[in-house]
Every structure is written in C-alpha cells, then in structure tokens.
C-alpha cells in the first residue's frame, strides 16, 4: 500500500511539473553555466538603422549549452534600449531576440521563450565588458534577496556579419521575461499607466526590499510610481501581484536596468539633475516613506544575506581583480551603514521619498 501511495505521489508531481509552464519551461534560467552563442546577421544594416528606426533583421543563432551538441535556430534580431542605442556612446546596441513558433525552440535551451532581451557589449574594450558583468551580477544579487526578481543567464556571444566573418566575441546575458517571472512566483503581471498606482498600494515589504536594493547598488535611475508619458509604467520597473489579490493592491515592484548605478559605474552614467549627489557612486535613498515601517525587517534580511551576496561577486572568475576590489569596497560601505542603526535612520528612513498620494500632506 505504501508503495502504491509513493508511486501515485511521484506521478502527481510529474503531472504538475509538465502542466505548469513556469516549471516545465525554466531550463534557460535554472542553470548558471554560461551559454556559448554565435549570432550571424546583417549587423552593418542593423547599426545603420538602430539609432533612428530599429527594424527586425533575420539572423542565425547557434547555441551550445554545456556538453550538449550545438543547435542552430533561425531568429530575428532588433536593436532595443534607449541610452545605449541612441546616446552616441555605445558602438553596439542591446538586442531583442525573437524566436519562431513553439516547435522551432522545442528541445533547445530556449524552450518556452518567444522573445528575450540580450545585453551586449556596448564597446569592444575589456573595461566595458567588466561593467556588463557587473550589471549581470546586480541581477544575481537581487535573486539572493528575493525570487520575485528577474533571472539572468550569462553567455559568451560571438557577433558575425556573415559566415566568413571571425566576428567579435564578448560577455553578454539574457534576461527573463516579466510574464515568466510572474508565473514562476504564482503571481500575475500588472500593467498600468504612469501615476495610476501610488506607493500606498504597494506590498510594503516588497517595496522596501526593492528600494533598499536600489540604494545598495547606488541606483537613482528609477521610479515605481511614474514613467514616460504614453508608456507602460514605470521607469525601470515592472510589477506583479498575487493572482487572487484585488486589482492594483499588494503591488510588488521588480527593478531592472542597472547601468546607471554606482555599482556598475558606467562611463556615460551621470547623477540625475535636481538630486543632492555629485556622481552615481554617491548613495541616496529614494525608497518610499510608505514602506518605512517594513525597513527594520528588510535591513535584517540584507544583513543576513551579506555573505551570500558577497560570494556572488567574489566567486565569479570573469571579474578581474581591479573591478572585484572596487566592487567589494562599494558593497562593504553599504553593509557598514546597515550595521549602524543611527545611520539607517538618518540615511534611509529620514530621507525617504514622499509618494504621490502623500505629497499633499507633507
């Protein structure tokens, strides 16, 4: 009888795994081993149109995942992003990879994927590559704090203009889609216009956690309440909530896009106008006052995960000694602040950002 029950339980677990898209199609982001990718595409044409009017181009993607044989897929690629695409600083823009139907990716590491953001190298220099690695590690740090975060997968990517081109090979990474983040966390994705949701409607623990993360990495390039006019809210954040929650309550912000952070310290990143900082490596807390009540427990979470987060940085062999030492120092200064309750009060609790709903009362 016990054996029958065990078999039934195992069968039920197997059925659940294959019935759940979030579990059945997580191969790409369930492994940390870097992919080997080669993209062959008309990159001269792509670069010519990238700044003004990005259009999709046909491409071939060859990918190797660990010891598995190389697989080749027909895809489309398109320049994406804003600063790195149009700002005149990067020689090469980030890309969007668009796959075909489900059958075209079945049996590959991209099973279940339709579109993916690929973060590329910006400029073909080692220091730029190190900063792309730091962006990748910023995502990994937030994964340590909460599973309600974007997962990323590292890749060594070769970009070729044609089959006879040796190409340029640099570190890059792909980013999980927000719908997959929601499914994986048994949540639903929320979409709304700028200023349609206020800080009072957030899951306050999640909002404090996200706000402290942005402070940790020294990022001021974000807003959880407002975004560009006519675009999905908000600025460098997307949102989910529990599937059974009331509309636009218990909202969980999920930050992304960290190239303007002090943690990365991109050469083109400048401090926002109007804020009392001289450069991006100077931290300023911009989390919302509505979340202050959760901050003591969130600070405790971060302190408890210090060793694990530092290991993410120190155990990555791709980061060179110069950048590792600089990054360790930057992180150590954050944890030194958390160890001092008076500094937490004066540099995090007190300077919090007043939300839209509270702006008339302060």
Provide a role label for each language-model segment.
Residues 1-6:
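Positively charged n-region of N-terminal signal peptides that target proteins for export
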Residues 23-362:
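Phosphate/dinucleotide-binding and metal-coordinating scaffold of catalytic cores
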